[in-house]
Amino acid sequence: MNIFKQTDSLSLMKGMEKETVDLVLTDPPYIISKPSGFKSVVNGEKRFAVSTEHGEWDKPENFSLEDLGESVNEYYRVLKKHGTAIVFCDLWKISKVKRLMEKAGFKQIRMIEWIKTNPVPLNSKRNYLSNAREIALLGVKVSKPTFNSSYDNGIYQFPICHEKGRFHPTQKPYPLMWALIEKHSNAGDVVLDTFAGAATTLIAAKNLQRKYIGCELDKEYYDKAEERLK
């Protein structure tokens, strides 16, 4: 049972039976898109800022925290007891996403941190720190989740995806998703990603002998992701 559809998160899950998934691992829109690049600033000096213009799918008129909350509720419904959900989110929305997960019923909420070993510098005196990390929140349905490790500090260090093989602006590195799936599920388990993007989660699940269910709404990304899954 490997399923990949071109549809939205809620439409996919509304057709799923409850308690049929072992692990949710997903990277929804951060809702941070805005124009950037070379701009005139103080005293006419031009400075460069890394683009956060990811696309229409990442804008508040097309996706909101309320929309994410509906998906989180469905994650809880389709997860088996003792299942785990890992949801990537914007650094500045951690507390809001945590509340969404708590409201849905998730317990043992923890933070996972991806440290980028080759971050893109921001090159700005006003915002001088590099974009060197991203955050995911982990929640458990009921208790006693699958955890294939004796210890984990929740910090993962991997480089960002190189241009070769990268076509999605927020594409996560394969080794990161592989590590998360390996630790939080077992062979034969079902992994769900309802914001599949480049389908990296689904590919890692397949290679780890897990089953996968996923979807991607954007037609261009869906077609490219489907090719990667072949």
Residue positions per predicted region:
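Conserved SAM-binding loop
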Residues: 225-226
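Core catalytic lobe of class I
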Residues: 1-214, 218-222
